């Protein structure tokens, strides 16, 4: 039915009806009303009632049988009720091998009718596009759930834990990361913290002093500089005893850029990339989805995301940006970087012409230089370049290369003055190049496993699946490559048939089918997430809210209604006190269970 296709595209029911009216020439020619569409949608959702979780597990296990690189695991509670799961496919696992140095993790809600929490692991590829490494569904946001999810993520990724992970300030998640990723640098989302200043400071203080606090946070190059600037800003604003600011200062090692600028972050300092990913996926999914509906729509969104990456790969392979100068380094890097990173490098190279280099000191081991802008203002500060002569290494105080992986304008100015015409390989980060995805990826740690036959078969299948997938990605970028690989597949397929006829096929028994499961999986309960509850109203909003109106006397804001209004005649119906209290509870709700005051 066309309505089901509209629903899969996340077209609201009211808009579906308008489209049917336009197609039919008016509402009188449609043959049904909007209520009929809603009833049909409900009947489709009811088809999965009671078997939704089991259908989801069956689907994932069938995916695992079709592709041995697909990873999936789940857990149930003591009542065999579905509580959490994690999944990732071969494309995401291979992407993690190339781009898994930095991971952004953030949870979101309203993606399925059970309220299960959607928890994707995302990163950034060589085109600076958001990519998915894996996903989880959780029934709660407790430490145990996060520990389970992070362990499954680690189990799926042969590359190991990321170097850096960016999250919000959730204490349960923070504890879980310290347990599962003890060597990973954990950073809090800077954007979220900066946005809280307007809530935590009174309006006058925020207006007068926020800019100086923000400058201390964003423009400090070292931890000493930040602490000095922060202390001055707190003193000027008389905020030394502010509880929240004191807490944030104690946590400064987890969110202030000065403490992280030496750690590669792929240019990210917040979880906004994860939140933009949430917004992208929510264009395809809704809170009414069953688990299977969610997965079907999620996969459609994922295919769209990966198509954009293939388009960018195609552009890099078949289009060449126009050179802006005759500097040899420019013609070198235009063939190395992806278009996105090339444009960033070009901007740095263009800006480098506005800087001059001043020698401070040169010794046997180090050379110290100041790099200053020709049009430097009194507020701008020079950058300090350190040249380590022994290894011919260049370090700039702006730390852009360490943080983003792109040589800064100060380094390029130094190279130009010293007639370095080609960028040394040590300053070319492979993850930003067109060859970034040319990496080895083997999910098994033992190439020559001598174990049970089914393990040997699985090991061989994993390796061949990866190589075939990598070839398909490369060949599909061009028509010629597609035709060539297709012909080679036909040739190899015939050779494999002949080979298997003359060779003993070694392997093991088939994996147990999901339908052989001993105990049925129960659908998850509707989950009340920590963000639920009635919205807390400000005192101003409460003051302007109108009270109850008695329909007997017409007065508003009184403590009675028509049933016990004193202005009515003696024959009026008067209910007892218990009924009145029951009515009040129904109108206003109770604090316990319906409001989250924490």
Label the model's feature ranges.
Residues 34-37, 129, 133-135, 164-171, ...:
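Conserved beta-strand -> loop -> alpha-helix junction used to position metal-binding or nucleic-acid-contacting
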Residues 50-76, 183-248, 254:
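Surface-exposed, charged/polar loop-rich segments
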Residues 16, 105-109, 130, 165-168, ...:
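Short, conserved catalytic/metal-binding motifs centered on acidic residues
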């Amino acid at each position: 039915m066309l309505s089901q296709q509209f629903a899969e595209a996340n077209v609201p029911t009211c808009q579906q009806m308008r489209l049917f009216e336009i197609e039919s020439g008016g509402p009188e020619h449609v043959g049904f009303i909007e209520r009929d569409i809603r009833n049909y949608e409900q009947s489709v959702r009811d088809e999965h009632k009671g078997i939704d979780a089991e259908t989801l597990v069956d689907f994932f296990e069938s995916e695992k049988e079709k592709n041995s690189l697909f990873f999936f695991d789940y857990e149930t509670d003591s009542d065999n009720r579905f509580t959490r799961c994690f999944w990732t496919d071969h494309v995401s696992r291979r992407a993690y091998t190339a781009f898994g140095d930095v991971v952004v993790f953030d949870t979101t809600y309203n993606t399925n009718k059970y309220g299960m929490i959607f928890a994707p692991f995302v990163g950034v590829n060589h085109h600076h596009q958001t990519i998915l490494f894996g996903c989880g569904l959780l029934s709660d946001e407790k430490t145990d759930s996060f520990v389970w999810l992070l362990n499954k993520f680690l189990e799926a990724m042969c590359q190991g834990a990321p170097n850096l992970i960016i999250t919000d300030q959730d204490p349960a998640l923070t504890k879980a990361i310290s347990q599962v990723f003890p060597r990973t640098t954990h950073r809090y989302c800077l954007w979220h913290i900066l946005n809280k200043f307007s809530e935590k400071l009174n309006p006058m203080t925020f207006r007068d002093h926020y800019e100086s606090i923000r400058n201390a946070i964003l423009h400090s190059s070292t931890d000493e500089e930040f602490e000095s600037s922060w202390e001055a800003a707190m003193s000027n604003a008389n905020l030394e005893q502010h509880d929240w600011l004191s807490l944030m200062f104690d946590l400064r090692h987890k969110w202030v850029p000065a403490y992280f600028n030496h750690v590669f972050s792929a240019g990210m300092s917040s979880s906004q990339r994860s939140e933009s990913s949430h917004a992208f996926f929510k264009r395809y999914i809704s809170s009414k989805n069953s688990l299977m509906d969610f997965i079907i729509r999620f996969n459609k969104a994922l295919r769209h995301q990966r198509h954009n990456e293939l388009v960018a790969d195609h552009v890099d392979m078949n289009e060449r940006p126009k050179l802006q100068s005759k500097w040899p380094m420019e013609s070198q890097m235009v063939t190395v970087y992806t278009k996105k990173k090339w444009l960033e490098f070009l901007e740095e190279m263009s800006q480098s012409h506005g800087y001059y280099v001043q020698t401070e000191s040169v010794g046997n081991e180090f050379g110290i230089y100041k790099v200053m802008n020709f049009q430097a203002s009194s507020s701008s500060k020079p950058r300090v370049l350190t040249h380590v002569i022994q290894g011919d290494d260049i370090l700039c105080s702006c730390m852009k290369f360490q943080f983003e992986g792109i040589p800064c304008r100060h380094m390029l100015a130094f190279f130009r003055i010293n007639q370095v015409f080609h960028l040394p390989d040590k300053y070319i980060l492979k993850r930003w190049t067109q060859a970034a995805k040319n990496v080895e990826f083997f999910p098994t740690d033992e190439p020559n496993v001598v174990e049970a036959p089914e393990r040997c078969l699985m090991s061989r299948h994993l390796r061949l699946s990866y190589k075939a997938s990598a070839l398909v990605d490369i060949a599909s970028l061009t028509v010629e490559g597609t035709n060539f690989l297709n012909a080679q597949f036909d040739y190899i397929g015939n050779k494999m048939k002949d080979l298997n006829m003359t060779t003993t096929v070694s392997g093991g028994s088939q994996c147990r089918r999901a339908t052989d499961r001993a105990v049925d999986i129960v659908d998850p309960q509707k989950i009340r997430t920590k963000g639920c509850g009635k919205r807390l109203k400000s005192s101003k909003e409460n003051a302007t809210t109108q009270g109850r109106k008695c329909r007997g006397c017409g007065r508003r804001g009184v403590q009675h209604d028509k049933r016990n209004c004193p202005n009515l005649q003696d024959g009026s119906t008067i209910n007892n006190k218990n009924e009145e209290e029951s009515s009040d509870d129904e109108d206003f709700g109770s604090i316990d269970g319906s409001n989250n005051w924490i």
